[in-house]
């Protein structure tokens, strides 16, 4: 399994708007693409100094599945224009990790 991790940042004022956009449009759109090997996405949020940090963690069966999502240059970020207008800054590249151990205790959350 592959984990794709990406960071984006908003002002405090835009944080709720961005989270709503992710939940109601962007994540739904990703799911509706029916990407073979796509397993899901998590959203993390925290306040850091003068901004709000968001981290997305996506789960895929393989790098081929990641490439189906992000394209040949799969390390490049995938940030829709609507999100770019809300974000104050974001990582241009995503990080990819091979998942070596998975603890399913999170299923009880």
Regions picked out by a protein language model, each given a short descriptive name:
Residues 3-9, 42-74:
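Short, well-ordered beta-strand segments in beta-rich or mixed alpha/beta enzyme
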Residues 39-52, 78-109:
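Glycine-rich beta-strand-turn "strand-cap" elements at beta-sheet edges
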Residues 1, 30-33, 44:
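Exposed boundary/loop context
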Residues 24-37, 59-96:
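An amphipathic, aromatic/His-enriched active-site/gating alpha helix that lines ligand/cofactor pockets
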Residues 9-22:
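Short, surface-exposed ligand-recognition loops at beta-strand->loop->(often short) alpha-helix junctions
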Residues 16-18, 51, 66-68, 104-106:
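Short acidic, gly/pro-rich beta-turn/loop elements at beta-sheet edges
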Residues 12, 60-62, 98-103:
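Non-catalytic surface loops within mature trypsin-like serine protease
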